[in-house]
Amino acid sequence: MNNRFLDACWGKPVDRTPVWLMRQAGRYLPEYMAVRSKCTFLELCKTPELAAEVTIQPIDILNVDAAILFSDILTPVEPMGLKLDFVPGPVFEHPVRTMADVEKLRIPNPEEDVPYVLDTIKILRRELAGRVPLIGFGGAPFTLACYMVEGKGSKDWANIKRMMYAAPDVYAALMDKVTMMDMEYLNAQIKAGAQAIQIFDTWGGVLSPTDYEKYVLPYTTKLINGLNRQNTPVIHFVKGAGTMLETVQKAGGDVMGLDWHVNLGKARDVLGQNMAVQGNLDPTVLYAPKEVIEAEVKRVLDENAGRPGHIFNLGHGILPTVPPENAIHMVECVHRLSQK
C-alpha cells in the first residue's frame, strides 16, 4: 500500500512528498464529464457505484497519493430538513433565519439518511484495495451554516453575520445543531472506512480573527474533539486564514490546510513542528506553461525545506477548465523533485 499520505499526516518521514488535489474528481476530466452527462450532480453524489467510479478516476489518471470521497459538503444538510438544489450552485429553498427555523431542524442518522455516502466509502475501500488511502470529508460547522442561513452562495455573507451579531442565541442554537450533525456524519464515515478526514471551512476566512475566535473556533474545536480519530488523521482547511493560523490551530487536528496567500515555510514556523501542513499552490498556476508549473512546484517544495509532514496540494480546488495534462505534469513534478 502507498502510505505516503498517511505517514505525512502523522509527520513521519517519506521517500517523496505525497500529493492529491482538492476537487481532483471533477469537471476538468473528460472521464468525469462522461459519467456526469448521464445524471444530475445530486444523482451522482447519491449513486454509490458512480460516485466510487469518479473518485477513482484521478488515481488512475493523475497518479495521486490519496483518493477523496466524491460528494458535496451540503449532502448531510438536506436530511436536516432543508430542500437542496443545484442551479448551478447550491440553493436551499427555505433558508434558516429564526429560532423557529432552527428548532425545526433535525439531527440526521447517517446510516438511515445518507446511506449512499457510507456505501460509496465501502465500495471504494474494496476497489482501491490499499492502492492509496481514502479521505472522507465534511464542511466545517460555520461554512455549512453560511449556506443554510444565506440560502445560496454570497459575496459578503451578510445574513449569517447579521445573525451572529444581532441574534446570537439563534446563531448559537444553529451552530450547536450543525456541529452535532457534522460529528455524527464524520464519525459514520470513519466507521465505514474513511482513513483520513478533511474539514473544509471555505468561508471561515471571511471573518476577522477576533470574530473567528469568538464565533467559529469553539464549534470546530468541539467537532474535532468529538471525532473517533485514534488512527484517522484530521486535516483542517480554513480558506483565507493566513492572518490567524495560530488561532485556527487551537481547533486541533493533525494537518493544517493552507491556501496560496501564505508562504508555506513561514506558516510552518508559526505552527511548529508538531503540525503537518497541506498545500499550497495557487490553482491558476495549472494554466501556465509546463516549465512555469515545474518552477512553482519547486518553489513550494523549497519553502517546506524538506521538513517531514508536508502534503502537496493546491490552495483550493482545481478549476474546471484546467487541461488535465497540466495536472498530470504537476503531480509528476512533485514526485520527481521531492524524491529522497
Curated annotation (Swiss-Prot):
Keywords: Cytoplasm, Decarboxylase, Lyase, Porphyrin biosynthesis. It catalyses: uroporphyrinogen III + 4 H(+) = coproporphyrinogen III + 4 CO2. Signal peptide: none annotated. Pathway: Porphyrin-containing compound metabolism; protoporphyrin-IX biosynthesis; coproporphyrinogen-III from 5-aminolevulinate: step 4/4. It holds the Pfam family URO-D. One of its GO terms (molecular function) is uroporphyrinogen decarboxylase activity. It is an enzyme of class 4 (lyase). Coiled coil: none annotated. Belongs to the uroporphyrinogen decarboxylase family. This is Uroporphyrinogen decarboxylase. It comes from Geobacter sulfurreducens (strain ATCC 51573 / DSM 12127 / PCA).
